[in-house]
Amino acid sequence: MSIFYLRHKDDTEVIGVSFSQVQADRFGINWRDAYIATLDDLGFRNIRVATYWDRIEKSPSEYDFSELDFMVQEAEKRNAKLKVVVGQKVIRWPECFYPAWLDKNNPGLVAERTNELITETVNRYKNSPAIESWQVENEFLLKTFGECPKQNLTNEALSREIETVRTLDPSRPIELTQSNQNGFPFLGPNTETFGFSMYRVVHNNVFGYYVYPQTGIYNFWKAALIETYRDTRVTIHELQGEAWGSRGNEELSWEEAQRSMSPKQLRDNLTYARQTQIKTMYLWGAEWWYWLKETQGKPEMWETVKNEVAR
């Protein structure tokens, strides 16, 4: 495992962030303003965005990429880099964003139409200098989380999607992802990078608030094993930067939100992540930070993130 340490000890740290217009809409904020502020005020130059199928293809084979066009164009203006999540299972609840016209319980049809969506997306943006990488699906083989028919989430479908992206845009790396609480990814197709999520303090209806027991050193060893076994590079695709409470964050008071996320907890999470020697990490929570600052009079999370990104 010393090879893993030596391989990465001189790597430049990259702190990126995920951004979802769907989540911004839940908070009732202007997602375009929030996205621009994430670029300009927070100073992020690595952003993960997603293709929301139900917003892009509201009618069969009629595509509206205006939202993603805006994000790509604004990133280009600033020399920012985007990781674009493509597929049927992407970021934010309910994970799978099937259009109303699609029979989501027909795995063959879903697989075919997913590949058509991926093809349209990759061909549209592969010539943009803002696109750094493609993430194919999001924690795709985690079948216990999200409102997705389990029969659609197969290795065969995933492998086909990866091959589609690789054929259309062979020059860019592809990333797969997994929840950190779900073992080691010994099965499944290989890609150039592999991301796992990292959450620290969460809530469920059985235990209430609790801290995940995995240590930073545990994740160092896990990352080393993944890189060795799968011949890939490991990233943290979701580092907890927002509250995980008993209700949606738009319904949590600031007092309750701080039970799982606060400025101190954010700094602690970054320290924890750095113990792994994984140098590329994407924070989770940009829409919440903006909502707190703009509508709740609570700029503390926003300012903490700004200071960390500027380090």
Where in the sequence are the language-model features?
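Boundary/entry segment of secreted carbohydrate-active catalytic domains
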Residues: S2-R45, A50
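Acidic (Asp/Glu)-rich catalytic clusters
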Residues: R7-D10, A34-G43, D69-N79, V122-P129, ...
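Hydrophobic faces of well-ordered beta-strands that scaffold small-molecule active sites
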Residues: E13-F19, I47-V49, L82-V86, E132-V136, ...
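Short, acidic/polar
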Residues: D25-D41, T114-R124, Q178-L187, S262-Y272
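Aromatic-lined substrate-binding rim segments of carbohydrate-active enzymes
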Residues: R32-F97, L102, C148-E175, P189
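Active-site cleft segment of glycoside hydrolase catalytic domains centered on the general acid/base Glu
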Residues: P60, E95-S171, P185-P189, N204, ...
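Glycoside hydrolase catalytic-domain groove-lining segments
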Residues: N155, T167-E250, E300-E303
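Substrate-binding cleft of secreted/luminal carbohydrate-active enzymes
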Residues: R233-A310
